[in-house]
C-alpha cells in the first residue's frame, strides 16, 4: 500500500485512499522517540474515544451526520453548544478540526507547499495537546524545542499519544 515519496490519505470510514506526493527539496523528516512508556489499553486513550463518541451523539441532535468528520470547522462552531459536556466538546473540536487539517495537508502536499504542511502539523500538535489532551510534558518539550530550530517547518506528536514518538 505504501508508495515511495508519498503520504497516504486514508478515509477511515470508507477505507478509500489516495497518495499525496512528498517533495522535500532537501528537507528531512525526523522521528524522535520520547522514550515515555504507555499502554493504549490502560491509558486515557479509551476515555478519549468515549468522549468523542459523546460529542458525536450530542451534535447529532442538531446535525444529520454520521461522523464528526462530516462537519466543517464552521459547522462545528455553529452547533458546538449542543455538546453539553465541556470535555466532550474539546474532543469533538479536535476530531473535526483535525479532519479538516488533514484535508488541507493533502492539498498542501499536492501543491508542494511544504510550509503550509508544516504549519498544519504545528496546529495539529497544539490541538492534540490542548483539545484532545494526549500529549505529555516530555513530548511537549521535544516539540517546543524543535519549533525553536531555524528551518524546522513543523513538529507534532504521532501515534496514540501519551508518549512514544
What residues fall within each predicted segment?
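C-terminal nucleotide
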Residues: 2-154
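Glycine/serine-rich anion-binding loops at beta->alpha junctions
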Residues: 151-165
Amino acid at each position: 500500500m505504501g508508495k515511495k515519496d508519498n503520504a497516504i490519505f486514508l478515509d477511515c470510514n470508507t477505507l478509500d485512499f489516495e497518495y499525496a506526493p512528498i517533495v522535500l527539496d532537501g528537507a528531512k523528516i525526523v522521528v524522535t522517540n520520547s522514550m515515555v512508556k504507555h499502554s493504549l489499553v490502560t491509558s486515557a486513550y479509551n476515555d478519549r474515544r468515549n468522549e468523542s463518541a459523546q460529542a458525536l451523539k450530542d451534535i447529532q441532535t442538531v446535525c444529520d451526520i454520521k461522523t464528526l468528520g462530516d462537519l466543517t470547522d464552521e459547522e462545528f462552531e455553529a452547533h458546538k453548544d449542543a455538546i453539553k459536556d465541556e470535555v466532550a466538546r474539546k474532543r469533538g473540536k479536535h476530531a473535526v478540526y483535525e479532519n479538516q487539517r488533514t484535508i488541507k495537508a493533502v492539498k498542501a502536499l499536492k501543491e508542494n507547499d511544504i510550509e503550509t504542511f508544516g504549519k498544519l502539523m504545528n496546529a495539529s500538535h497544539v490541538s492534540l495537546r490542548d483539545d484532545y489532551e494526549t500529549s505529555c510534558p516530555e513530548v511537549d518539550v521535544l516539540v517546543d524545542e524543535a519549533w525553536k530550530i531555524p528551518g524546522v517547518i513543523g513538529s507534532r506528536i504521532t501515534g496514540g499519544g501519551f508518549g512514544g514518538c
